[in-house]
Amino acid sequence: MGNRGRLIAPGGLRDELAAVAEDEPAAGESLAEMAAQYGLRPSSARPRLVSYLVKVWQRRHFIFAYATARNVSMYTEARLGQLWQVLTPLLNSAVYYLIFGVLFKANRGISNYTAFLVTGVFIFAFTERSIVVGSTVMRANITLIRALHFPRACLPLAYVLVEFQQLLLSMVVLFAIVLGTGEPLTWYWLLLLPTLLLQATFNMGAALFMARVGAGAQDISQLIPFLLRVWRYFCGVMYSIAALPAELPVWAKNVLSFNPAAVYISLTRFAVMSSYRADAPGAKPYNAARCAIFTVKKTPSMQAYCHPDITASELWLAGVGWAVVILVAGVLYFWQAETRYGRG
């Protein structure tokens, strides 16, 4: 008989069909326009930057817990456990000492080469490892990324926190070596705290930047160790940039001195090594004759009578500048690809 004469209760099928018909896009209106009209957004859409940063901050406890758990589990299968966090840079320092200090005489112009070298190795290793793990973190955690919804920036930040926790453990050994080689404990050591915080900030930005690069180009992880090895040789880890041959232009020395890793290494040495501060160019009134002795013979104490190419204040400004610029650039670069992680 059809539907003629049949009563349909209010709110029944006919009303629902009418409501659907009313909500259908009008002629010429796209689904995107209709979604915008009702305030609908894709569930996987990239959030606004401020909202994204707020979400990252809200998950700070997850970042800390994840980093701590990973730090504890890293060496569970090794018999010496977390001692490898300290043994690795110490072994590297021993090798560099034999090659550069004994064979190549890179200790010329440096009063306390042991403390100078170990400080450089430990500080550079913090940045080096942060960049390496940053380049692989997204692919290494692809299952976690696909299973859970959270700001992806939490992962690179957690891995940098792992490296920072390892650095703090290494600092105990570094302090013992520095004090054991005759450096006194002074108030300058307090400058180590802002130095490490600036370096950690720089490392977070670098890790975020490399996380996006590594997520899109897996082969980059094979190239990164080589590039970092080259970078290490240009940072004054094993030698004094100020003691390089006089034939090297001043601008070239400034480029070496102002690269970020060299800046944080120099600031750390300035904080914990009294001999480094005493021998720094400009530490004493300028004396052309004594400066010439340093230029020829590389006598450490004579370096203090030379004009400084870079002052401590300039190093601090460079340290702050690198930290802020790289963090902002890393956050923006990583955030722009937030919805792409986990698709590969």
Label each PLM-derived region with a short phrase.
Residues 2-344:
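Hydrophobic transmembrane alpha-helices and immediately adjacent juxtamembrane helices
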